[in-house]
Structures are given as structure tokens and as C-alpha cells.
């Protein structure tokens, strides 16, 4: 088994876990590409990505171009003479000249079973859609968006209580060892490239804060999925009014679906120690864990202890 000279391109913690797996293997990471440092925290100080931090701890040269389209950036990358580039949640588009630079091309770790959920938010969209199963695909990159030939897939179930955070953690456990298996056998023929069936593909659009607003004209089943899919970001929310008529926005972290009651969508049906029950177009959404603006996360019961007037029975939420 030949050790490969690898350029690793990635940015968040999910990517750093893959970089660590490669560092623990017999392969050589000759350079790391990651997003430029970004302002973070209250002081808006520039913060290095998790991948950059790990690379610097291991004395690996770090490159942070804003784009890979400039000729000098491409020449610099080519001169590294890598066998393969591994891309995990990098955040920049790789032009054809970069894809063609390494001897064995570019590999990507994608957080779904392709061709389902190509695009930016595969983990979140699999929960949002109510999928029972997902996984990770390791593919040979081409110029399309997650359209390359598939080399290896690993599967995992999506539990009924799964959030994007918990599913992300599951895939971060599964994927690095699958990547090492592919790298170890890249030239042995163990993994045969499988074309994607474009007719079976769909696109995982980025999440937005607007989409996170709970819309009572949707079925309760969909809203409960949204709450789990939009955790840890952007977090599902809705608004009610206090006794003075001021809007109060609450984030929702946990809810359950109850049988339908024939009331207008958005009607508060009950609010007690068992939760805050709101009618939807199909089914009742029972809110269990909420967070008022500027306060800590709390149970519905604790919220009602101080703010019961926000949830008058019969009130219709927008």
C-alpha cells in the first residue's frame, strides 16, 4: 500500500476530524487549504478555522486564498505536486484546472447518499424531508455540483428524535474511516467508480432564517421535522404578543405531534405542564422546550410560570 501525498481542503470541525484521520494514517498531508480567517465572537477578532488550527499544530503549510480562480493561486497549488486533493466542507469552488492538477484527481466527502441531496445542506435536508436513512458518499470530483462518480458509501439511520447536530456527529464518526479506506485502496481497484443517476437527484438548498419561522399552515409533522433540522442553526421560532401588545419571539428546540383538532391553524389549544399545544393545518404541535429572547432554554412549564399571558387559550398566532 503506497502512501499518498495529499492536499487537504476543508474548513469546519467536520473537516478537521477527517484531517486528523489522515494525519493518523500512513499518508502525508503536504499542504492544507482552508477559508480565510473570519471575525468571530463579541470582539469580532479574526478566528482561524478548525482545519487551520489543526494544520498549524502539526506544522503543515496552510494556504487561504479567497478564490482558486487566479492563475498564481493555481500555479502555486500545481507546484505542490500532490497525488490527490481531499475536499471536505471547504467552501470554495474548484475550477477544472485545480481538479485536474493532482495525479489521482480530487476526492470529496459528502454528507448524504448521492445522488440524493446534492448541494449545501444535505444533513439538514434529510431530516427536514423525513428521510429514514442517510450516510456519506466519497466521490471523485468533477466540474458539477456533487455530480462526480461515487467510490464508496456508508449508511446510517435517522432516528425520530434526530437533530442536525446529532446527525452531524454520527456522520463525523462514520466518514473519516471510510475516507481512509478509499485513500488506502485508491490505486488497488477495490472501489469501482459508479456513475450517479441524475434522474434520482435532488438539491439540498441552504437554510435561511426566514424558513425557520414556524408556519402554522404547514402540517405538524413537517413543523416538528423543521425544529430538529434547523438545530443548531438557524433554530425554528415563532412570535406571540405579551399583555402590552409587544411582539415576543421564541425559539423552539423540542416539540411533538399530537392528533388533529378542528381549529384554525395557529390557535393555542392548551398551555400547561404538558406543553403549549398549537393547531396546524394537519395535526397539533405541542411545544416542549423553548427559549425567549435573551433568556435561557426552558421547558414549556417553566416558561408558563412567568409568562402564561403570552399563551391565552383560543389566541390565534400569526
UniProtKB/Swiss-Prot annotation:
Membrane-crossing residue ranges in chain numbering: none
GO molecular function: methionyl-tRNA formyltransferase activity
Origin superkingdom: Bacteria
GO cellular component: cytosol
Pfam annotation, one family: Formyl_trans_C
EC number: 2.1.2.9
Disulfide partners: none
Binding residues annotated for (6S)-5,6,7,8-tetrahydrofolate, in chain numbering: 112-115
Catalytic reactions of this protein: L-methionyl-tRNA(fMet) + (6R)-10-formyltetrahydrofolate = N-formyl-L-methionyl-tRNA(fMet) + (6S)-5,6,7,8-tetrahydrofolate + H(+)
Keywords (A to Z) from UniProt: Protein biosynthesis, Transferase
Function summary: Attaches a formyl group to the free amino group of methionyl-tRNA(fMet). The formyl group appears to play a dual role in the initiator identity of N-formylmethionyl-tRNA by promoting its recognition by IF2 and preventing the misappropriation of this tRNA by the elongation apparatus.
PANTHER family assigned: METHIONYL-TRNA FORMYLTRANSFERASE (PTHR11138), METHIONYL-TRNA FORMYLTRANSFERASE, MITOCHONDRIAL (PTHR11138:SF5)
Family recorded in the similarity comment: Belongs to the Fmt family.
UniProt-recorded name of the protein: Methionyl-tRNA formyltransferase
